[in-house]
Amino acid sequence: MTAAYLPSILVPLVGLVFPAIAMASLFLYIEEQQIS
């Protein structure tokens, strides 16, 4: 039952949330390098 609507939650999570976290961490890394 759970597996029916699991992909509809998992796909946006991987497709939107993970790149957002990756860009945010990369942005913070670049900012940290510029300050130092």
Curated annotation (Swiss-Prot):
Domain of life: Eukaryota
One Gene Ontology term, aspect cellular component: chloroplast thylakoid membrane
UniProt main location, coarse: plastid
GO biological process: photosynthesis
Disulfide bonds listed in the record: none
Keyword terms: Chloroplast, Membrane, Photosynthesis, Photosystem I, Plastid, Thylakoid, Transmembrane, Transmembrane helix
Subcellular location: Plastid, Chloroplast thylakoid membrane
Keyword Endoplasmic reticulum: no
Membrane topology of the entry: Single-pass membrane protein
Record-linked InterPro entries: PSI_PsaI, PSI_PsaI_sf
Signal peptide per UniProt: none
SUPFAM superfamilies, per database record: Subunit VIII of photosystem I reaction centre, PsaI (SSF81540)
Transmembrane segments: 9-29
Function: May help in the organization of the PsaL subunit.
Stored PANTHER family: PHOTOSYSTEM I REACTION CENTER SUBUNIT VIII, PTHR35775
Similarity field: Belongs to the PsaI family.
HAMAP family listed in its UniProt record: PSI_PsaI
Protein name: Photosystem I reaction center subunit VIII
Species this protein is from: Oltmannsiellopsis viridis
Lineage: Eukaryota, Viridiplantae, Chlorophyta, Ulvophyceae, Oltmannsiellopsidales
